[in-house]
Amino acid sequence: MNGAKQAPEISVNRAGRQARIVAILSTESVSSQSELAALLAVQGIEATQATLSRDLEELGAVKLRGADGGVGVYVVPEDGSPVRGVTGGTGRLARLLGELLVSSDASANLAVLRTPPGGAHYLASAIDRAALPYVVGTIAGDDTVFVAAREPMTGAELAIALEKLK
């Protein structure tokens, strides 16, 4: 035996497995799918890398690095749900803006938000989920989020509004 205690394998459906993944990612710093598979195995849940990859995508999990560029860890949106306008979305958005927003700029109807490397998708998802009435939508790269303002708001006004939320 390799020393790691492993529970007997149990049969868990997709929803149960994903609930365990959310629980693990909310309490552990997991930097790889193989590490996640090992943590699930300890609980008696066997999952292939392909299955974990699909689960992480469905949960909206992203790998986030700190501003220092250290090792990335998986994070899942607090509610684990891919739906817009979840309860508490603006409170969560305010917290994430405080943690991730490095700077903001604007052009025409776009607010351009800068994050640490790897943070843009997570911030864009939070903006989308908050369902702000003055936001049409977001596009995220690695460290940049374009946020489209709903007319008559300008990108500069939107950038200021988002800065005030943090």
Swiss-Prot record:
It holds the Pfam family Arg_repressor. Transmembrane segments: none annotated. GO terms for molecular function: arginine binding; DNA binding; DNA-binding transcription factor activity. Its main location: cytoplasm. PANTHER family: ARGININE REPRESSOR. Regulates arginine biosynthesis genes. This is Arginine repressor. It comes from Mycobacterium marinum (strain ATCC BAA-535 / M). The gene is argR.
